[in-house]
């Protein structure tokens, strides 16, 4: 089944395609259909933002749509950056956002650096069917980046049970967490 990913993010396309192609889904960025739908993420939850994106792209395309909203929630920062993860501290690059996060956590000891990655996926079909799923992965924030893979906050998000950051995981290892 062909599905449009409501995103311009190539990293998301690669990760989601690796998982969903096994289930018979053929995922493509909206740009591959000549679309560039700019959605103001005005929601206060990952669910709201995911739905906003899915509805806008489905309205523009008339095709089944997959949208996600995801982010990092750090307990010592009362859940920040949360839904603002991609624009945390008004920084434009992953490295700048990581530096800003680490600066905000500089006085927080290791045992209080608990966090979780949250991902909400919304699937909409033109016939009105809707599926919304939420996943959470607990971990800790390191004092410095480690690893070269992934994107976003992956280099500082540490999984104690695997003794690796997301950025140190092979794509297959990371995808296994999601399934």
Regions found by a protein language model. Name each.
Residues 2-4, 11-179:
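Anionic-ligand binding patches
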């Amino acid at each position: 089944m062909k599905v449009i990913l409501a995103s311009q993010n190539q990293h998301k396309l690669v990760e989601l395609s690796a998982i969903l192609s096994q289930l018979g889904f053929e995922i493509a960025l909206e740009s591959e259909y000549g679309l560039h739908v700019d959605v103001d993420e005005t929601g206060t939850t990952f669910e709201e933002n995911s739905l906003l994106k899915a509805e806008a792209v489905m309205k523009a395309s008339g095709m089944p749509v997959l949208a996600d909203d995801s982010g990092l929630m750090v307990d010592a920062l009362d859940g920040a950056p949360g839904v603002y993860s991609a624009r945390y501290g008004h920084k434009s690059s992953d490295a700048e956002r990581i530096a800003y996060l680490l600066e905000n956590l500089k006085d927080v000891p290791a045992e209080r650096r608990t966090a979780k990655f949250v991902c909400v996926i919304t699937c909409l079909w033109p016939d009105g069917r809707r599926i919304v799923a939420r996943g959470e992965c607990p971990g800790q924030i390191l004092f410095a980046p480690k690893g070269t893979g992934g994107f976003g906050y992956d280099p500082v998000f540490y999984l104690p049970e695997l003794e690796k950051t997301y950025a140190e995981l092979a794509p297959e290892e990371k995808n296994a967490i999601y399934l």
